[in-house]
Amino acid sequence: MLHRIPAFLRPRPFSGLPLSCGNRDVSVAVLPAAQSGAVRTENNIQRHFCTSRSICSKKVDQSVPANEISQKAAESQGRGKETLKKDLLDIIKDMKVDLSTANVKTPKPRGRKPSASLEATVDRLQKAPEDPPKKRNEFLSPELVAAASAVADSLPFDKQTTKSELLRQLQQHEEELRAQKDREKRRISFTHIISNMKIAKSPSGRASTRPQHQIQFDEDMDSSLKQEKPTDFRKRKYLFKGKRLSIFADKAFADEPPEPEASPSLWEIEFAKQLASVADQPFENGFEEMIQWTKEGKLWEFPVNNEAGLDDDGSEFHEHIFLDKYLEDFPKQGPIRLFMELVTCGLSKNPYLSVKQKVEHIEWFRNYFNEKRDILKENNIAFT
């Protein structure tokens, strides 16, 4: 409660010192400012009407003119309009609304009228072309429609208009999403079609430019040609099934003897041995050493054979032993006959020489005695 100011009380001059709440001098100190036409500021109101008994230490601001206060009020009102417009646009842009808000209705404030900016926004939204309800709600789920109606009921505007605008915004996003999906499907289907495309070929095929009288070989043997050929080129043409031209004689090719296989020369054998010696490595175990000794002839080959290493010339056993038939040209008696019998006896007991080598050995002695015939006559030795 403010105390009344008596008429006879002389007001004191205004001082810059703060005054406590409930003091009688407060009203008296304010009178000079009121008489001069100044308006109370927010600081003065806060200083005079306080609930605490402590002394306010804030400095008293100077009185503000009325035109500056009106400018501040206009700016605050403009900011309020912008914030309200921004809040409305944020509500419209939000698409995801919980279903729990569908049955909740916020009480509308009584006696509150929408501002001019909100009315202008609503009018602008009403003038926007609206889609038919069936087409608009075609792709929207009933949950989104119920959520949009709940949001429209919670706003202090026309319910149908707000609901239609929310559904239109949701429908726009849904159409953009479906258009993007359609583009992806179209791209996938196009690449799938291109990958499965095949070049169509005419069934007739290209005519062959090769003359008919020319011999045609089988061209399907080429492994690099893996593509399927038309039906006209699949027929194989063999060289020996056609009509004979009778150009070459058959006997000329049939009488040719087969070429004998040339045996490797001494130099080739020696070169192979050198290569083998270069590639030889030290033995890893005793078995490899025994194998090498067997190849060199130092060990018997298994299974053990008495004739191992001997060249079999196809001769029989008696041809190695009975060699008397090769002594017909030698004398029937005398020292030469005795010597040749000893030679044949030694050759028959030699298992390392072949029959051919034994015969050559006897022939060498025959030729030797024929060359020394003159010497034998001088010594009275008969060779015949």
UniProtKB/Swiss-Prot annotation:
One of its GO terms (molecular function) is structural constituent of ribosome. Component of the mitochondrial ribosome small subunit (28S) which comprises a 12S rRNA and about 30 distinct proteins. Residues 101-136 are annotated as: Disordered. Its main location: mitochondrion. GO terms for cellular component: mitochondrial inner membrane; mitochondrial small ribosomal subunit; mitochondrion; nucleolus. It is found in: Mitochondrion. It comes from the Eukaryota. Residues 121-136 have a biased composition (Basic and acidic residues). Keywords: Mitochondrion, Ribonucleoprotein, Ribosomal protein, Transit peptide. It comes from Mus musculus. Belongs to the mitochondrion-specific ribosomal protein mS31 family. This is Small ribosomal subunit protein mS31. Pfam families: MRP-S31.
